[in-house]
């Protein structure tokens, strides 16, 4: 609706809008002003509404969450779906704005290197996507999951953005020691083979064994060709063998021989993945797709709630247990309930932290 200009006002007055004395008729000016005010108010309302709509649209756009997959493997899509569903549910329960976030799932092969700055959070799944994010997405908040600690993708040399967080598949070594403790009080002597330069694993294992009052026997190797000799020496002195996620020691070439050697000595082996248990290990603490999704979900919620994220490198927050009943029977070991093992581990973990 166009606003009345001064010429139109004059025309209105020339058409009998004056009284006999030539003065404007009483109330005409006030009526005209009221019309102007009403129309100006209408325009202001439209302007405010437009600006508000633009602000809401910008906020919604900035609230987008992008999940980048390294490839088309089923596990990536399973984790991405679990992240989406669990995050929306948690954000809704906590009344966070991420409950209305738009989740996008893409593979890195379909992306342009110049990704727009319209995502509040980016999640990468797998090593390739994490490496892509390091190179191209250093202006975003990034959570990289489904990556092993041994990949050494994290660097503190300043080449990485301070808002790139690494959520490792690896379980803390203490959880594997807790599993051994929960399986049987008879497992007092624990054996483990580690790389000679892996001081972090050595320190962590020694501390955990001390807390749980277990005797730890460590064999260190410099060369993968020495695994057999070190393993045989170790198996004579232990009740149970612990595998650590070191690809120099445990890989497609060595796993079968390690399992056979342990089985011949009637020594159960604790793995670090579900695949290891399916191959012949007695049990393992590992990260399921849902565990990984929950860990990512918790970090996303912290961003939206303004909470501080304390560490850029994070070990798995959640865990699952897999127990191989067939291996247990072949070793004359009693079958254990996974729920029972989890409960025992959690209770003992609480005891050691009290």
Which stretches of residues belong to each language-model region?
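N-terminal signal peptide c-region/cleavage motif recognized by signal peptidases
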Residues: 53-55
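Short hydrophobic alpha-helices and adjacent helix-cap/hinge residues
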Residues: 57-354
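Intrinsically disordered, low-complexity segments enriched in serine/proline and basic residues
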Residues: 2-4, 21, 26-28
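Bacterial N-terminal signal peptides
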Residues: 42-51
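Ser/Thr/Pro/Gly-rich low-complexity, intrinsically disordered segments
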Residues: 7-10, 14-16, 21-22
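Cysteine-centered motifs
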Residues: 33-36
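Aromatic (phenylalanine/tyrosine) cluster motif
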Residues: 12, 40-42
């Amino acid at each position: 609706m166009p606003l009345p200009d001064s010429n139109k006002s004059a025309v209105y007055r020339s058409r009998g809008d004056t009284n006999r004395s030539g003065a404007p008729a009483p109330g005409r000016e006030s009526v005209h002003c009221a019309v102007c005010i009403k129309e100006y108010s209408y325009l202001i309302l439209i302007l405010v509404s437009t600006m508000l709509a633009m602000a809401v649209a910008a906020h919604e756009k900035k609230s987008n969450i992008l999940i980048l997959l390294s490839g088309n493997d089923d596990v990536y899509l399973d984790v991405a779906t679990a992240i989406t569903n669990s995050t929306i549910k948690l954000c809704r329960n906590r009344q966070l704005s991420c409950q209305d976030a738009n989740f996008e799932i893409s593979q890195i092969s379909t992306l342009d290197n110049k990704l727009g700055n319209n995502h509040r959070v980016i999640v990468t799944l797998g090593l390739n996507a994490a490496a892509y994010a390091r190179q191209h997405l250093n202006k975003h908040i990034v959570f990289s999951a489904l990556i092993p600690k041994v990949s050494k993708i994290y660097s503190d040399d300043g080449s990485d953005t301070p808002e790139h967080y690494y959520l490792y598949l690896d379980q803390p070594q203490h959880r594997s020691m807790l599993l051994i403790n929960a399986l049987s009080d008879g497992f007092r002597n624990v054996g483990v083979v580690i790389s000679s330069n892996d001081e972090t694993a050595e320190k962590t294992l020694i501390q955990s064994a001390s807390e749980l009052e277990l005797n730890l026997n460590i064999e260190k190797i410099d060369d993968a060709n020495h695994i057999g000799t070190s393993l045989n020496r170790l198996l004579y002195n232990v009740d149970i063998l612990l595998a650590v996620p070191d690809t120099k020691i445990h890989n497609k070439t060595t796993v079968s021989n390690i399992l056979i050697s342990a089985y011949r000595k009637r020594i159960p082996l604790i793995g670090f993945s579900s695949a290891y248990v399916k191959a012949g290990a007695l049990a393992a603490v590992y990260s399921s797709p849902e565990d990984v999704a929950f860990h990512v979900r918790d970090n996303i919620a912290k961003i939206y709630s303004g909470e501080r994220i304390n560490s850029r490198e994070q070990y798995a927050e959640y865990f699952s247990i897999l127990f191989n009943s067939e291996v247990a029977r072949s070793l004359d070991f009693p079958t254990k309930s996974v729920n029972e093992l989890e409960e025992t581990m959690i209770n003992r973990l609480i005891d050691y932290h009290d």
